[in-house]
């Protein structure tokens, strides 16, 4: 579990551009980040699982049972690795096709968002300016009170608190007025964006291209399923000896333990 947590922390703390920084590659697309996350997570689970198996085999019970779990784990890991290698090109093709087929929709939505952003930016700038003015006004009023505190020390602490409370409430109330005004100004654009999104989705639903995309997606999934069958069969064949060996070892250990109990 520690390895899984570490992998997730590294992935998120380094950010989506970590590969771009270290390898000087082009920034990753969202699809690439999803695929990299899946790879990191699977590798972390595999490594942490091997650590737990190793710890168990090193324990007194593990040595007594002598199940050779670590050897079986390595065999299983190699089999899974071969499966990933065989499915790699297939999954890459599926993600590439999906990204290509939905590119037009992302472009349309980005265009709508950019248009709304340009229209609401003046309101956001005005709100930020007014908020900064209120904060500066509050700071000017609080400054002399801080000097009073330093001069009067603890005996004036309660008095200072009483003076600060109405100032803080006044700042809160004035900020609320600006927020309400901003919300009122942005409401038409929010409704407009919601209507545009609904229109886009309705157009997609009624468009023949949706049926075409559905057919393409079904075709991609069918191709992925057909190409994955041989790899999954190889995985099953690779697991059978591991499971049989584990079954035999466990049964032998149970039988030996039963004999020892009967002999006592």
UniProtKB/Swiss-Prot annotation:
GO cellular component: chylomicron; endocytic vesicle; extracellular vesicle; low-density lipoprotein particle; spherical high-density lipoprotein particle; very-low-density lipoprotein particle
10 X approximate tandem repeats: region residues: 67-264
Gene3D superfamilies the UniProt entry points to: 1.20.5.20, 6.10.140.380, Apolipoprotein (1.20.120.20)
Residues modified to Methionine sulfoxide: 109
PTM entry text: Glycosylated. Palmitoylated.
Cited InterPro entries: ApoA_E, Apolipoprotein_A1/A4/E
Subunit structure: Homodimer. Interacts with APOA1BP and CLU. Component of a sperm activating protein complex (SPAP), consisting of APOA1, an immunoglobulin heavy chain, an immunoglobulin light chain and albumin. Interacts with NDRG1. Interacts with SCGB3A2. Interacts with NAXE and YJEFN3.
Protein known as: Apolipoprotein A-I
Organism: Jaculus jaculus
Gene behind this protein: APOA1
């Amino acid at each position: 579990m520690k390895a899984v947590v570490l992998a997730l922390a590294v992935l998120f703390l380094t950010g989506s551009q970590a590969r771009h920084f270290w390898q000087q590659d082009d920034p990753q697309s969202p699809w690439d980040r999803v695929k990299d996350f899946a790879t990191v997570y699977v590798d972390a689970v595999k490594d942490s699982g091997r650590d737990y198996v190793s710890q168990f085999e090193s324990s007194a019970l593990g040595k007594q049972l002598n199940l050779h779990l670590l050897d079986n784990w390595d065999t299983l890991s190699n089999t899974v690795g071969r499966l990933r290698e065989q499915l790699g090109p297939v999954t890459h093709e599926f993600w590439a096709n999906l990204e290509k087929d939905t590119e037009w929709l992302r472009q349309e939505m980005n265009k709508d968002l950019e248009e709304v952003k340009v229209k609401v930016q003046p309101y956001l700038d005005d709100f930020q300016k007014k908020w900064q003015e209120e904060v500066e006004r509050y700071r000017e009023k609080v400054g002399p009170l801080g000097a009073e505190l330093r001069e009067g020390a603890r005996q004036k602490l309660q008095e200072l608190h009483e003076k600060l409370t109405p100032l803080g409430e006044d700042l809160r109330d004035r900020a609320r007025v600006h927020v309400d005004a901003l919300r009122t100004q942005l409401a038409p654009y929010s409704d407009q964006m919601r209507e545009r999104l609904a229109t886009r989705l309705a157009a997609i639903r009624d468009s023949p291209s949706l049926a075409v995309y559905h057919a393409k997606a079904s075709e991609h999934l069918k191709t992925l399923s057909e190409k994955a069958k041989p790899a999954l069969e190889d995985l099953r064949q690779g697991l059978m000896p591991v499971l049989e060996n584990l079954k035999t070892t466990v049964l032998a250990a149970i039988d030996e333990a039963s004999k020892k109990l009967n002999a006592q």
